[in-house]
Every structure is written in C-alpha cells, then in structure tokens.
Amino acid sequence: MESGGGSSTPPGPIAALGMPDSGPGSSSLGKLQALPVGPRAHCGDPGSLAAAGDGSLDTGSTGELSGSLKIPNRDSGIDSPSSSVAGENFPCEEGLEAGPSPTVLGAHPEMALDSQVPKVTPREEADSDVGEEPDSENTPQKADKDAGLAQHSGPQKLLHIAQELLHTEETYVKRLHLLDQVFCTRLTDAGIPPEVIMGIFSNISSIHRFHGQFLLPELKTRITEEWDTNPRLGDILQKLAPFLKMYGEYVKNFDRAVGLVSTWTQRSPLFKDVVHSIQKQEVCGNLTLQHHMLEPVQRVPRYELLLKDYLKRLPQDAPDQKDAERSLELISTAANHSNAAIRKVEKMHKLLEVYEQLGGEEDIANPANELIKEGQIQKLSAKNGTPQDRHLFLFNSMILYCVPKLRLMGQKFSVREKMDISGLQVQDIVKPNTAHTFIITGRKRSLELQTRTEEEKKEWIQIIQATIEKHKQNSETFKAFGGAFSQDEDPSLSPDMPITSTSPVEPVVTTEGGSGAAGLEPRKLSSKTRRDKEKQSCKSCGETFNSITKRRHHCKLCGVVICGKCSEFKAENSRQSRVCRECFLTQPVAPESPSPEAPAKPRRSTEKTPTADPQPSLLCGPLRLSESGETWSEVWAAIPMSDPQVLHLQGGSQDGWLPRTIPLPSCKLSVPDPEERLDSGHVWKLQWAKQSWYLSASSAELQQRWLETLSTAARGDTAQDSPGALQPQVPTGAAAP
C-alpha cells in the first residue's frame, strides 16, 4: 500500500477484517482470496504479523482514509466489521505471538479458503482496479465458494427454527403450569364450585400433561442432544400431532369461560381476591387470567406457521420431508377443528342476539339454525302501495318477517310472519312506478318487498334463491328410502315394494296386493303435516275452510284434506274412521255386517315411519327418541361419511318432526342413572347447551356402538382416525346397523 508516496505492506489481513484499503489500487478479488477463514486459518501467519506490526492505516495523497469498503460474509448472515479508526484492535490482533488461534468468523470447514495471504507488489496494485471484472480463471472458484455458503445456510436456518420451536414450547408449558397448577388449584382450594372451575379451565389439565410430559421432553432431547446426528422434527410432530385435536373442546368453551371469569369476579369477593393475588405475582408478568387463558387458543396456529417455515427451508430430498408434510397436514386439521369450533360459537352467539332482539317470540336458539342474512327492507302495502319499514331475518330453514318496535332497550322487533324455506319462491318484478321490488311467495301469503338500490335487491334475491336450493339438496338426504325402516317395523311389507315420493321431505309408500285392516289395503300412507294444515280449501268440493263451520279433516286412507260433508263415517271397534268419498266408494272402510266370530285382523299402521338416509354413513339405523324421557318417537339416525361430525335425525310425519341436524363436537354424552327409570330399553343422553335428547337402542351392543361413534365425534375426532373405525354403512333393504 502507499502512504504519502510510498512503501507497501501486505493488505491481506486488513482487507479480511474490513479495514480501509488503499483506494483504487486494491483488488476486490484479492481481498476475497485473503479472507482468513477455514479450520487452518489463524492470525499468526506472516501477513498477519506484518499487518499487526504496522499500527498506522494507509491513506491516500490527502492524508485521509481512501475508502471503507465493507466485505459481507454473503449467505452466512454475518457481516464483517465496517471501517474503523486508526489503532482499533480486533480479536485476531491480540495475542499474535501465541500461535494458531480459532478463526475470527468461526466458519464451517466446508467454507475454508486459502489461508495463505498473497504478496501484492506495488506494480500489481497499480495495475489492479476495483471496478474491473474478475479474472476468468478465478470465476469458477468464486462460484464454488458461494455454493458452499448457500449449502451451509440451509441447515443453520433449520436449526434456528427448531430452537425457536423449543424456546416457545418451554414458555408455553410455563403458561399452562400457571393455569393448571396455580390458578385452577388455588381456586379449587378456596372452595369455588367444581362446575365453575370446569367451566373456566375446561380440559386444561389434559393439555398441560400432554405438552409437559410428552411433546416438550421429546423436542428438548432431539434439538439439544440428537440434532447433530438426527436433524429431524417431522417424526416427533407426526406422532404427537393427532393429540392436538383436544384443543377443540377448549376453544369451544373459551367464550363461556371468559364470561364466567368476569361474572364471578364481579359477584364473588373470594374469587376476585384469589385471582388478583395470583396476578400480582412475578410469574404472571402483570397479565390477567383472561390473557393467559387465550394462549392455548393461539398455540395450534403457531405450530402450523412454524412447520410451514420449516418445510420451506427443508430440501426436497431430505429424509424428514414426508414426515414433516404429514405433520403439517395433521396440525392443519387440528387448527381447522379449532377454527370450526370458533365459528360455531360465533354463530350461536349471533342466534342468541337475534333471539333477544325478538323478545323470545321465536325459539331460534337451535344448533341446526344458521343466520344467513338480515337487514332492513320495505314492504309495499297491498291496499295502496305505501312502503312500510320492515326487517327480514333469513335463516337456513325459514324467513322471519318482522316489524320494528320503537324501544331503546329490550325487544327491537316483533315477528309478523314466519315463512318456511321449504316451498318458498322468490321472484324479481318490474313495476313502472316502483323500483327495486321483488316478491317472496310462501304457502300462506306473499310479500311484495322493496330495497333501496338495485344491487341490494339482486343480493337479496340471490341469497334467498341459494338458500332455497341448498335446503332442497339437504332435504333430498331424507327422501324415499322408507323400505329399510318400515320393513323392520312391519315384516308383511314386500322387499320389492315400489317407493314414490310426493315431496322432497316426506315420501309416500305405495303397496301392491296384500291385505289391510278389515280386508282393506290402503293405497297410500296418510300423514297430517303442516302443509295439509295450511291448505285453504277442500280437495273434493273446493269450499274454503274456516275454524267454525268448515273444519279440516284428513282421509284415513289417502291422507287428503277434506271437509266434514265430503267424508263418510263407519264405526270400527268403537272408533270412527273418516275417509273421503273416493276411498269409501272404491274400498269401504269395514264390512256392513261384520261377523262376530270373525277374528279381527291386525290393522296396518297408516302413519309414515322415518326414512333411511341413502348416503354412506359411519353408523345409521332406527332409534327411539324423547326430549323428556316420557314420550318416545321412532326416528332414523345417521352419521354421514361426508360430514362425520353431525347427527341427522329423521322422524315420522305423525310426530310433526322436521329433519334435525345436531353438531356432535359441541355435545355431551352420558348414560342415565337407573334411578331415572326410563322405560325404553338401552338409553343414553345427548346434550347440547340447554337442550337434551334421550336416545334408545334395541340392544346393549347397538347402544355401545352408537356411544363409541358419538363419543369420537364429540371429541372433535373422526371415526376414520380412531383405531377400529366403523366401516361405512349404506342402508339397503331392512339392514339394521
């Protein structure tokens, strides 16, 4: 190098440490070649001694530093020190006489470069130029060095991700210990009721044991002791990830738990004192109980993010690739379970809000109901076309047409009309004097509605039409497959019985041949449905019904709605059988002069029975159901393969039952005590929130199969994931589950 006019010293060590060079006279390639990295590179070589002996920095002709070129250590993530002032000491300048020492940058052996510092003559310095392209024969060597740096950075980043996972897991286990062993234990010792403790902390003890006794120890052993020989995470996570589904129960209960904490803090001084005394401790970090309760809700999505980052850095041919991908799939499933539970809780909260707005006029707080859309709308008067303010609530099974109430608190709307989605029609209309109008037509009445804009009208029409179509698709699940259930009830029915359907929800079974009550074979099974009740006129004479002089009746054979004049009466075993004229003339109800010696033939039931689900199911079959434990009804129950976490129940039309769908992950199962004295065989109880149902099977074995399948779904799992999973069932003939 030149100083003032002058002499030169070997620039290698200075360049390697990022010291100022001599300006235009130094070569960038020479600096890279002089970088003392590698296992044999040390500060005791001749070039280093020469540099250490000269404590002054080279300057240009002006006496100032000619440059401060910074040499980054490329992909290793470590930058060399930038330019420093004269006399600054670096680690490799201390103890030079002590012989070989570790490298300054601690580089991997694969990154080792030539440790010999080349001697650069003044002529070579004068001929070199910083802006020149590097020598062609040195270019492959530089490419090899960059490739080595890139290969080294991958394993290091994987190790950093693993260490981050371990660190966050240790912190998380401490939070779980705080919730389980401090808050929960102290509140229990203080005498807080057990049901309150369970409502607040749910299954936090199980989550704590899983992480503290299984996941954390395995991660710690692998990352701190075995990583050099077995750098893998996928095998551990794949083995333990299925247990993360237990978070579903905690997440579903979270909002209720937070509400309990707030309520008991306000109403119980003892509860408040215990919680506040713990929150003041250093282990709480000045955070509230609710804040710590939130951590399990957020933990599973964090696993998913870390594992995605790990897979992104993992080479395609790595031995851990398949295990890591499978682990991500399982963890994503657990995260989806948690998210689904959150969405169900949010939907239920919305239903409860609407229930309060309606003042409890309609019992809509049912897990099968789903609020799809609500909004203000105007109804055009049928008399003079005057617009009137109204409010619509669109659910998956009905529309509530409401009138606003002028109240600041409490009930906001009164239900004027309830319209079932089944049989509903929506139609766009164009009127010359009124814009943005459409008509909703139900079984009992039609509503002409108006929106503020054309876009709002189109949105309402599209959403209502989509809801109608979806309801039709769901109703087809319960179409005419009554042979499986009705034959099990009545063996006299032929397996080849033709099945027809007059509606997507309620099938009608027709028979050919055979004998019926008193020598009569019904042509159809009768049913008393809501649709029949809503019919306005007699099918025979056409006169309009009213509640006083023209009442509705049903034919006991074909089920049509008729008036009293159009029916005939015949005594039969001290009972009356009302039939229409057509059925009476074709096939009389009873012989006009029955023989007292003739044995009475068993009368075939004219009521429809629940029908089977044609879709493949994990478990399906006939059950008995009761909401009170006293009155029982026959139902067809099915857990479909397409959605194994819901229970479909289809009841007989004589019970006025509509299809019900019960979300199983939010339900609780129990077997009633013998003291309850439920006289219906093998019974168990299914409970959701404040609603409960009693279900009864025909045998203990069948009861056990239902309990196992329902329990699996209630835990947020699926039958396919559990050992000994049930085989899918397709109802055919009279097969029972």
Swiss-Prot record:
GO molecular function: guanyl-nucleotide exchange factor activity; zinc ion binding
Annotated coiled-coil segments of the chain: none
Ranges annotated as biased composition (Acidic residues): 126-136
GO annotation, cellular component aspect: cytoplasm; cytoskeleton
ZnF segments: FYVE-type: 532-588
Cell location: Cytoplasm; Cytoplasm, Cytoskeleton
Predominant subcellular localization, coarse grouping: cytoplasm
Domain PH residues, every copy: 370-469, 616-715
Positions bound to Zn(2+) 1: 538, 541, 563, 566
GO biological process: cytoskeleton organization; filopodium assembly
UniProt KW keywords: Cytoplasm, Cytoskeleton, Guanine-nucleotide releasing factor, Metal-binding, Phosphoprotein, Repeat, Zinc, Zinc-finger
Residues noted as binding Zn(2+) 2 in the record, renumbered to the chain: 555, 558, 580, 583
Post-translational modification Phosphoserine, affected residues: 128
Start-end of Low complexity biased regions: 500-512
InterPro entries the record matches: DBL_dom_sf (IPR035899), DH_dom (IPR000219), FGD1-4_PH2 (IPR035941), FYVE_RhoGEF_PH (IPR051092), PH-like_dom_sf (IPR011993), PH_domain (IPR001849), Znf_FYVE (IPR000306), Znf_FYVE-rel (IPR017455)
Ranges for domain DH: 157-341
Region (Disordered), start-end ranges: 1-151, 487-533, 589-620, 713-737
Feature: compositional bias, Basic and acidic residues: 521-533
Role, per record: Promotes the formation of filopodia. May activate CDC42, a member of the Ras-like family of Rho- and Rac proteins, by exchanging bound GDP for free GTP. Plays a role in regulating the actin cytoskeleton and cell shape.
Protein name: FYVE, RhoGEF and PH domain-containing protein 3
Organism: Pongo abelii (Sumatran orangutan)
Gene behind the chain: FGD3
